[in-house]
Amino acid sequence: MARILVVEDDLWSRRLVFELLVLRGHDVLCAAGVGDGRAQLDSVKFDAVLLDINIPGGGGEVLLREIREYNSVMPVIAFTASAMAGDRERFLAEGFTGHISKPIDVKSFGETVEGYLVASP
């Protein structure tokens, strides 16, 4: 079981991801934007973060940079509808551990997230 932070501004996406991960036995907390995510990260130790790119408060890249200042190894997964050619490579170059495109495949989503957890040091 991992403790996972989901930073996603869309309520329905947040609920879906929360339910899918909880059903797999994970402890999941959610935040709706950069400020909420920062507050959660300041008060709880997480094993991974699912981070939407287009969120209030500056965007996912802003929060990623803050996370990487103190934790270079925790999996931070870009969770976004941005699926244009080159997006995955750009996210990896920015410091994300991986990329999951929306809409998600509910059958494989949990396994995909867990793959990033297993691959982390």
Regions found by a protein language model. Name each.
Residues 8:
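Conserved acidic carboxylate
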Residues 11-29:
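Two-component/phosphorelay signaling modules centered on CheY-like receiver
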Residues 30-48, 69:
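Acidic, metal-coordinating helix/loop segments flanking the phosphotransfer/catalytic sites
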Residues 33, 59-62:
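Acidic catalytic/metal-coordinating carboxylates
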Residues 56, 84:
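The feature encodes the CheY-like receiver
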Residues 61-72:
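Short amphipathic alpha-helix used as the core "switch/output" element in two-component signaling
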Residues 104-113:
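C-terminal output helix
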